[in-house]
């Protein structure tokens, strides 16, 4: 079930990490702003990669994020669906729901805020969404980033900082001192063990499991 998706009010800051947290990931003392420009850019990349790994839908204009945003979806209904699978999860506010041009009240729907599932109801009965456009406006994402999500983002930031400081193709290095100084480096040939084709390594991806969206046809 596809929808037309629009970000109405984007997050003021889509980054999952504060500059203080990024400084800590880089091993800087509190208040050391010497690398803030570099770390701010790193934080943006890390947050974007996590959003990609979690399959967070964007509107083609704003950067997808797990931070809180006001969004709008329009579903073209065929009269056979009882559930709307919203593009964003962790919903904090359901602002507006209309079906075929008629506004619904709170008692007309049942929302699973964490899963992003919206059901049409009447009392204790589940109804099918009628033919026509179903419009949903809501706020989803986090104002305050959960600790486990911060931890995963910090791990990815540290990994990126570590990778930037060394050559990932170097398998091993040995130094001989006797006469002058001989440095020998062995390089990996082919794929580097532990590497990943995606933006987020498997161990960090496992920590993000509850934030990953499931694709719905």
Question: Model segments located where?
Answer:
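Divalent metal-cofactor coordination and adjacent catalytic microenvironments
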Residues: 1-217
